[in-house]
Amino acid sequence: MYAYIKGTLSQLFPTHVVVETCGIGYEIQTPNSYRFQKYLEKEVQIYTSLIVREDAQLLYGFINEEEKEMFLSLIKVTGIGPKSALAILASSTPHEVKLAIENENDAYLTQFPGIGKKTARQIVLDLKGKVTITEENSDDLLQTQVNGNEQNQIISEALLALQALGYSKRELTKVEKSLNKHNVNSVDEAVKIGLQTLVS
C-alpha cells in the first residue's frame, strides 16, 4: 500500500522512528532505528511495508529497497514473523542473509533471536534460489569523535536497542563489556559492534 514515506524524521526510538509528512506522524518499526540517526530533523525516505493484523496495522520501514525485499521474503517463511525478520536484518545486510541462504549456512541463521535449527532450515528450504538481492548496499555514516559522557550515552541507547530486539540480560552484559573496549562514535556503530559480538 505504501511503497515509501518521505518526510521529516522527527523522533527516534530503539524499535521505531516517527516520520512527519503533511501534518501526520507515521510510526515505523525498523530493524535498527539508529541507522537513521543522521537524518534526525531532516528529510528522509523510508521504504515501507504495511502489515495488517486483527488487532493492529503496523508499518515497517527500511533503509533501501533490498532490505525491504529481504524482509518480505523472510516473513513468508513458516515460523518467521516480522519481529524475527527485523532481528535478522538488524545485524545483517540483505546480501549477507542471501549468502547464508544460498550456502545453506544454518549455523549463521540460528545466531539470531528466535531462530532455531528447524526455522533456519525452513528459511533455506523456502528461499534458496528465490532471493533476488544481487549486491550489497552500504549506508556508511560519517564518524566524529565523542567525549566520554557521550560515549556512555551511546552505549546505553545501543543496549536498549538490542534489548528491544530480544537479546537476554546475559547477552547484553557481554555486549556492554565489548563496547567499553571500543571508542564508539554513534549508536548505530555501537549496535553494529554489539551484534557482531553476539554472532561471533
UniProtKB/Swiss-Prot annotation:
Annotated localization:
Cytoplasm
Region annotation Domain III: where it falls in the sequence? 150-200
Going by the UniProt record, its keywords in alphabetical order are: Cytoplasm, DNA damage, DNA recombination, DNA repair, DNA-binding
In terms of InterPro entries, this protein maps to: DNA_helicase_Holl-junc_RuvA_I (IPR013849), Hlx-hairpin-Hlx_DNA-bd_motif (IPR003583), NA-bd_OB-fold (IPR012340), RuvA (IPR000085), RuvA_2-like (IPR010994), RuvA_C (IPR011114), RuvA_C_sf (IPR036267)
A single Gene Ontology biological process assigned to it is: DNA repair
Q: Where are the annotated segments for Domain I?
A: 1-63
Positions of the UniProt region annotated as Domain II: 64-142
Q: Does the keyword DNA damage apply?
A: yes
Q: Which domain of life is it from?
A: Bacteria
GO MF term list:
ATP binding; four-way junction DNA binding; four-way junction helicase activity
Q: Where is this region: Flexible linker?
A: 143-149
Does the record carry Cytoplasm as a key word?
Answer: yes
Q: Which GO terms describe its cellular component?
A: cytoplasm; Holliday junction helicase complex; Holliday junction resolvase complex
Quaternary structure, per UniProt, is: Homotetramer. Forms an RuvA(8)-RuvB(12)-Holliday junction (HJ) complex. HJ DNA is sandwiched between 2 RuvA tetramers; dsDNA enters through RuvA and exits via RuvB. An RuvB hexamer assembles on each DNA strand where it exits the tetramer. Each RuvB hexamer is contacted by two RuvA subunits (via domain III) on 2 adjacent RuvB subunits; this complex drives branch migration. In the full resolvosome a probable DNA-RuvA(4)-RuvB(12)-RuvC(2) complex forms which resolves the HJ.
- Function according to Swiss-Prot or TrEMBL: The RuvA-RuvB-RuvC complex processes Holliday junction (HJ) DNA during genetic recombination and DNA repair, while the RuvA-RuvB complex plays an important role in the rescue of blocked DNA replication forks via replication fork reversal (RFR). RuvA specifically binds to HJ cruciform DNA, conferring on it an open structure. The RuvB hexamer acts as an ATP-dependent pump, pulling dsDNA into and through the RuvAB complex. HJ branch migration allows RuvC to scan DNA until it finds its consensus sequence, where it cleaves and resolves the cruciform DNA.
Domain comment quoted from the record: Has three domains with a flexible linker between the domains II and III and assumes an 'L' shape. Domain III is highly mobile and contacts RuvB.
Q: Which family does the record claim for this protein?
A: Belongs to the RuvA family.
The name this protein carries in UniProt is Holliday junction branch migration complex subunit RuvA
